[in-house]
Amino acid sequence: MKKVSSKLLAVISILVIAFAAIAFAGCTPKGSKTKIKVVEAALAEDPIAFGMAKTEAGKKTQEIVNAWIDKNKSTINDLFEEYAKMTDEQANAKNIEYKTEADPAKKDKQFVVATSADFPPYEYIASGTQKILGVDIEIAAKIAKELGKELVIQNMDFDAIIAATAKKDSLIDIAMAGLTENEERREHLYFTKVYKVDKQVMIVNANNKSFDGMTTDEINKKIKKLAEEKIGNYKLVIGAQKGTSSFGIAEDYAKDNKKIEASSYPNPSLAVQDMKNGRIDFVIVDALVAKVLMAKFNK
């Protein structure tokens, strides 16, 4: 009996150690080496434009910027191509001069831009610096130069931009933040001509095969199915940047299904990091932004 008991104890000890190892592994932070990929099918297509207050001054700015867009379509395309390939070293070498505070006494001498510098390649803070760069910032600098005005860049949370720009007494001339023009936003702002059409896509972990090769309709059905497969109180969690059209899509999924949750983030990078760490299932973002995030997280 003692001999049998000893064997049993030995087996139990091995099992305890094994389960402890598994439990410890489960507590190890996920995601540090997890790569990500983009599901290519578009969930939606977005017209990207600049916004300004519904005032006489806003109308004048709209006309000026529309004329600039018409004359500089090739320049805009070149900027998107440049920023798609830009390295940290190249970004750090750029020198766009701007101030960060608008001066009421210089209202007619400054070109004041509201942005949210967390949305590459449209606008972002260059790695290891405090410099705000991006396609929108380059365009702003070129317009300010043509107008003979000093460029002012006011960086703020994305979901504060529309209200800050729309205020009748605002010093902001224009919102340049990868803004999708839509009916709701047109209630608050004038919009320029569309300067870029982007699409909304999903980012998933690279080992996630759920949506491979699917059309948009197939993706929508698959999302519903995955949500239904969640057990108990668990939900399918979709991450996106707060206040964006990406988050609007996530909310639409959640509105139609109680097993889906839309989770908002200050910027897309944080959403992707949470996905890599297993806290959410996937992220919705603009396709151009997705490319930049792929380069960042798959280094």
Language-model features, listed with the residues they occupy:
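Extracytoplasmic small-molecule ligand-binding "clamshell" domains
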Residues: 68-82, 86, 99-100, 104-179, ...
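Bilobed "Venus flytrap"/periplasmic-binding protein-like clamshell domains
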Residues: 117-120, 129-145, 197-269, 287-291
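A ligand-binding cleft/hinge motif common to bilobed small-molecule-binding domains
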Residues: 28-44, 160-163, 177-188, 248-253, ...
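Hydrophobic residues within well-ordered alpha-helices
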Residues: 30, 50, 65, 143, ...
